Amino acid sequence: PRLIADVRGVLDRHFWEEGPGLFCDEWNRDWTPFSSYRGMNANMHGVEALLAAYEATGEQVFLTRAGRILDMFTARMASAHGWRIPEHYSADWQVDPDYSGNPMFRPAGTTPGHSFEFGRLLLHWWDLAGRPGGDAPANARRLIERALDDAWDPARGGFAYTLGFDGKVAIPARYWWPVTEAIGAVAMLLKLDPQPSDEDWYRRMWRFADT
């Protein structure tokens, strides 16, 4: 509890932006402004932390904040961009389509592996929240299935690292982590909202991961 409280204090003072209900990304060591960059990735990992904090403490604020972040990037941003999630934003949370940072950590375009992760986190939040009515399961499936269709390499297996906003492969490298996220996402679908095609995808991806 002490560690969670200490971390929450730092996040509340420096990173959480109550207006949009999102985390900013970065500061200098003395807490002076470093950049105006805003990103999806920090918020995605923020959701992971918030859900873990909720499970550890039962404090509703953590679940509520996770839900606000998820709504922004799934119900709003993904739905407006063909169920692909833009990665990079300006300080007022407008999509920055021209941003291109470090190709490993802040690549241009969209990242299918993050769609898998967001889909899994949306289902996790929905389950913890008592499975309320609404579009969470359907939106999670839309994210996951779009990434499966866009990025799977039918000849070699695995997923392309990045896509353009049109869904075309930008960086074809197939790293280990997107397939692990995809396996976890489809496992959540099988647990919470199963469809006949899910088992086939689950086994197909495990066969690739085992090679």
Residue ranges and their predicted role:
Residues 1-211:
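Glycan-recognition and catalytic cores of secretory/periplasmic carbohydrate-active enzymes
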